[in-house]
Structure formats: structure tokens, C-alpha cells
Swiss-Prot record:
Organism from which the protein derives: Saccharomyces cerevisiae (strain ATCC 204508 / S288c)
Keywords: Cytoplasm, Lyase, Stress response
Molecular function in Gene Ontology: glyoxalase III activity
Principal location listed in the UniProt entry: cytoplasm
Name of the protein described by the UniProt record: Probable glutathione-independent glyoxalase SNO4
Length: 237
């Protein structure tokens, strides 16, 4: 029997972003929880980034944001999570036909590379065309800007409903002016540009995720578990 396999994408960007000079990159909580959930549901999980590199968002490191099993999995060198991270692939090394689910994790680093990550977009579109699922969380839907449905040659999210981190959340974090000054986009703008319907949560920190066919999106790290479960359910629907 062919094993069930999921591919989690990471942003390759790891550079200065915050006003205090701290770097952004991958939001560790999102990938810890999605990885754990996939594994507990019988999936083999691999990580990929556009360049094969990644770094952690320095404002959201484990000491403040995780505990219990998540913390143990992050800090244990030979945990399944860290072993998978050590095998991270560049996007051009990945065979899309090996996977049933593409899961775009985020962190503010995704603002910089996801909209132009052509190889990641190519993998996601092929998985979707083969009957697989595309899921994205928080800033992950920025990958949809330029992602094409192979069968229609139209934007893959056109006519579909998506969610993702809202501008209200950027304002609450005090980074909305950084987005403006660096000409970085938002999930809602990507939705509008590609003729999708953006559905906002009542509050930016709510656990909120939605499914539209084989497309699944979640609004923040608190939605990691529900988004992953929706992706698994969508695969078998």
C-alpha cells in the first residue's frame, strides 16, 4: 500500500523585519502542530522551501509560545520533527506526484518569498491537479498570488473562499506600517487580486479555518490543528 504523504512548505526568508531589528522567518508553532497532526493520522511528512533554507521568526521562539509535547519535539534532537527538518528539500528536488497534501506554513517571512516562489507554486498546482489538497495557514495563502490551476489556466483561488491572517492582526502586532513601507502585501489583497472571496475571522486570534473543495485555509497558528484536520478530511471527501 502506498503511504500517505504530506509536504509542508516553509518560507526561505530569514532576515530583519521588526522594529527592534529582530528577524522574521518561519513561525515554529504552525509547523510543529501541523507535523504532529499529520503524523498522528498516519502521514509521512516532508519539509520543503524554495531554496532549501529557512530560519525561525525571532519574535515567536519556543520559550514563549510552546510547551508540553510541542516543546519536547522541538528541543529533542532526534525527534521525528527534527529528523524531518534535517531532510528539508529545495522545491526543485520535489516530485509532486509523491504527495497528496501540500501545506503552506508561514510566519512573516512568507511575505517576502511566497508570492514569487514559482517552484513551490508549481508543486502545489500539480498536487491539486492530481486530486490532492492544498492547505495554507496564516500568511501561507500569499503563495496563491500567481498560483495557477493547471486545468483551467486561471488563478487557482479564483471564485473560491479563503481566509488567512487579517490586516487587523497586523495592526495589533504593530507591523502594518512595516508592510506599507516595504510594499508587502496581505492575504486579503491577494484574494481580491485573484478574484477569490476573503473570509475574515471575528477576531484575528480565533481558531478559524475553512474548506472550499480541495482548498483549505486557516487564519493563524491557533488554527494549525483545525486546518490540518480539514486538509485530511478534504482529501477523502
Amino acid at each position: 500500500m502506498t503511504p500517505k504523504r504530506a509536504l509542508i512548505s516553509l518560507t526561505s526568508y530569514h532576515g530583519p523585519f521588526y522594529k527592534d531589528g529582530a528577524k522574521t522567518g518561519v513561525f515554529v508553532v504552525e509547523i510543529l502542530r501541523s507535523f504532529d497532526t499529520f503524523e498522528k493520522h498516519g502521514f509521512e511528512v516532508d519539509f520543503v522551501s524554495e531554496t532549501g533554507g529557512f530560519g525561525w521568526d525571532e519574535h515567536y521562539l519556543p520559550k514563549s509560545f510552546i510547551g508540553g509535547e510541542d516543546k519536547m519535539n522541538f528541543e529533542t534532537k532526534n525527534s521525528a520533527f527534527n529528523k524531518a527538518l534535517a531532510r528539508i528539500k529545495t522545491a526543485n528536488e520535489v516530485n509532486a506526484s509523491d504527495y497528496k497534501i501540500f501545506f503552506a506554513s508561514a510566519g512573516h517571512g512568507a511575505l517576502f518569498d511566497y508570492p514569487k516562489a514559482k517552484n513551490l507554486q508549481d508543486i502545489a498546482s500539480k498536487i491539486y491537479a492530481n486530486g490532492g489538497v492544498i492547505a495554507a495557514i496564516c500568511h501561507g495563502p500569499l503563495l496563491f498570488d500567481g498560483l495557477i490551476d493547471i486545468k483551467t489556466t486561471r488563478p487557482l483561488i479564483e471564485g473560491k473562499a479563503i481566509t488567512g491572517f487579517p490586516l487587523e492582526g497586523e495592526i495589533a502586532l504593530g507591523v502594518d506600517d512595516i508592510l506599507r513601507s516595504r510594499k508587502l502585501t496581505t492575504v486579503e489583497r491577494v484574494a481580491n487580486k485573484n478574484r477569490a472571496k476573503y473570509l475574515a475571522p471575528i477576531h484575528p486570534w480565533d481558531d478559524y479555518s475553512i474548506t472550499d473543495g480541495k482548498l483549505v485555509t486557516g487564519v493563524n497558528a491557533n488554527s494549525s490543528y483545525s486546518t490540518t484536520i480539514r486538509a485530511i478530511n478534504a482529501l477523502y471527501s
